[in-house]
């Protein structure tokens, strides 16, 4: 397929919707970094780098200047991506998903490498020809009249960067909104507020279309601060200090509230596999692909590259100059499924660790639990009895972090009764729930952590069954009616977080047990609504999943029937 068949903006909109759970509000952080740069950055060095980047040919000393300035910027910023190489294997993603990801990364690698070998002006493809061959080809092109003498620099023969180690160029380009805004303010002689207002309007336009140079010209009449943006088409590997339209659009995307802008995505190790899994789902739904044609990356290629560069940070807008390697270097797909040997039980004193989870999954659970903030209010709820729970959720309203998982019940008859009168979960939807997750989470909880619950008895029993008498519980003791004041609003706003409550819930015929609602009870959304009752309102902020969604269920074919 060719780039001409790519419906770019439709793909962008689909990616925004599909990855919306990981988009964040970054305006305050971006402006904090902007102020830090305005206070601490030497803009004489910035101007020097900008002049250098306008030259046709650059050498090692120029690269040193660019890298030194990038280091200075990185040291002043809070928003920066850290080197976090990711290793994906069967279990975190299915084998088919891993193969698809590996294939796309390889295609993207080939495309990027081809793009870097394409001539700067006439688009002549260099392939894997040596410099001697390229020079000779230029002479032949001149001989046959295709290329005029003296135009070698635009014919793709003379390199733009004449340096000893090309690998030092990696990750030294790409715009950073805080840098763009600070340069527009300082070098344009504008107030920070005027620059922010202009870029915000540009960002709002970006929610509906890709802004072009005509749009920029129109907006400039209202916002003179945008005059400093260069009236040039986007180029590959242009310096982040170049005030291009694409850099300004990226900055604008960070300054609007809403829109689920891809530029505001934040990645953490605990969410990485979930984001990749969701990306592949969106890709297949929209029939996206990696194009072999050299040139600018299409929306799918762009988000794939940025996500796979590092598993920690803001892929689009953070300072990334200190990351080594490229996306295909830093995200490694492993197909080796060799089993890890179980530890030998201790003979005298101490029992072997009994767990149904593989060590790598156990470690992922621990990292997810460690991401919780121990001093924040922490709601906890379960569905099902404490000795046979089918759903478990922890929710922290201040940070909007949550851990949520399911479990296949042992007592099927009792489960079906509870489904009918309470939680509405169907057996088929939890048939392949990964066993051992709830126990692993409880084992990993910090010592003496305090939880808040609506009804503490079942939670206390669950903790005690796991030997966690140290964990403390505060029971808010709301009435059934009080606890569900915000039920409809919570379900309307956050029902996408929980899709396993598909059954019909009916009122119990047992005397005195009529529920206050016939809506299904969800452990996660119950925690959200209980918290809303105490605070007096439902948050607009999207809760952030800490336990990767791909851990919740095992592949159906791996289910063992005894």
UniProtKB/Swiss-Prot annotation:
Role: Encapsidates the genome, protecting it from nucleases. The encapsidated genomic RNA is termed the nucleocapsid (NC). Serves as template for viral transcription and replication. The increased presence of protein N in host cell does not seem to trigger the switch from transcription to replication as observed in other negative strain RNA viruses.
Gene Ontology CC annotation, any one: viral nucleocapsid
Binding locations of Zn(2+): 391, 498, 501, 522
Main location: virion
Enzyme class: hydrolase
Pfam entry (one): Arena_ncap_C
Name of the protein described by the UniProt record: Nucleoprotein
Family to which the UniProt record says this protein belongs: Belongs to the arenaviridae nucleocapsid protein family.
Subunit details: Homomultimerizes to form the nucleocapsid. Binds to viral genomic RNA. Interacts with glycoprotein G2. Interacts with protein Z; this interaction probably directs the encapsidated genome to budding sites. Interacts with protein L; this interaction does not interfere with Z-L interaction. Interacts with host IKBKE (via Protein kinase domain); the interaction inhibits IKBKE kinase activity.
Positions marked as site (Important for exonuclease activity): 458
Superkingdom of origin organism: Viruses
UniProt domain comment: The N-terminal region is important for the cap-binding activity while the C-terminal region contains the 3'-5' exoribonuclease activity. A CCHE zinc binding site is present in the C-terminal region and may thus contribute to the substrate binding and/or the specificity of the exonuclease activity.
GO biological process terms on file: negative stranded viral RNA replication; RNA-templated viral transcription; symbiont-mediated suppression of host cytoplasmic pattern recognition receptor signaling pathway via inhibition of IKBKE activity
Subcellular location: Virion; Host cytoplasm
EC annotation from Swiss-Prot or TrEMBL: 3.1.13.-
InterPro entries linked: Nucleocapsid_arenaviridae, Nucleocapsid_C_arenaviridae, Nucleocapsid_C_sf, Nucleocapsid_N_arenaviridae
Gene Ontology MF terms in the entry: hydrolase activity; metal ion binding; RNA binding
